Amino acid sequence: SALTCSGSLSFEEGLELVLIRARAMQNACKDNNSTMAAILFLSDEEINTTCEDIENVVPANYNCPGQIVISGSKEGIENACVVFKEKGGKTIPLPVGGGFHSPYMKSARVELEDAVNKAKVDTPSAPIYQNYDAIGYTDTDKIRSNLINQLTSPVRWTQSVNNMIENNVKNFIECGPGRVLQGLVKKINRETNVSSL
C-alpha cells in the first residue's frame, strides 16, 4: 500500500503483487509443517539469543519492545514456548497457516521474485521503509530487492518506527480497519501522534 500511495506502483500492479505473494506464501505453507507464536515480556536480545539455541526457530516480527513473534517448525515452536515460559515470558501460539517471515517461505520468495522483477516500479514520492531492513529508500532497485527479501526475513516494525522518528516523522496515520499499528507505535514511542483513516 505504501508503494501504491507513493506512486511507485500502480493500484492494479500493487493488487497483482499482493495476490501473487499471498498465493506463493500459501503454497509454501503446504511444503512445510511450520507455525508462529507471540512472545511477550522479554527483551529482543533475550529472544534473539534463545532462538539461536533452539533448532528451527527464528524471530519473525519485532512488533514493539516486549512483543516479538517467532516462526519455526511446529515442534520447534512448541519447544520454544516451553523455554520462553521458563524465562518468564508469556507465549501465545498463533492460528496461522505457516511460519511466515522466515526461511520457511523460501519457495514463496522464488515465486514472487519473477513477478517483482517484471513489475513497473517508479521512484516513490517519499522514502519507503520496508520490513527487510527498516531503512527508507527511494531507489527502485533496492525497493525491488527488499520486496523479495522480506518474505524470508523478520518484520522490523520497531526498527522502522524508530528510524522514521529519527528522520523527523512525527505523525503516524494507520490506514485500514483496526488500531493495532497505532498501539504498537505508541508502545515504541509515547511521544508520537497516531491516528487512523
What do the predicted segments below correspond to?
Residues 1-6, 182:
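Short helix immediately C-terminal to the catalytic nucleophile in hydrolase catalytic domains
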Residues 4-152:
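Alpha/beta catalytic cores of group-transfer enzymes, especially the acyltransferase/condensing modules
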Residues 117-197:
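Acyltransferase/transacylase module recognition
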